[in-house]
């Protein structure tokens, strides 16, 4: 439990540093692009997996 608290604390400190440095906006844009790319790939692979395999 203490390990998880330490990990979340370090993530919060890193987020604070990035936020005050002005890098957070660029990283948020990159995260949004990666999220939508992953979402599109998930849908594509789901639809491709629904086909019956060739005999």
Curated annotation (Swiss-Prot):
Q: Where in the cell is it found?
A: Cell membrane
How does this chain sit within the bilayer? Answer: Multi-pass membrane protein
Give the main location: membrane
Classification via Pfam families: DUF1328 (PF07043)
> What Gene Ontology cellular-component terms does the record carry?
plasma membrane
Q: Could you say which residues form the signal peptide?
A: none
**Family label:** Belongs to the UPF0391 family.
* TM ranges: 4-24, 27-47
Name the UniProt record assigns to this protein: UPF0391 membrane protein NE1120
- What keywords is this UniProt entry annotated with? Cell membrane, Membrane, Transmembrane, Transmembrane helix
Question: In its keyword annotation, does this UniProt entry include Coiled coil?
Answer: no
Q: Does Ligase show up as a keyword for this record?
A: no
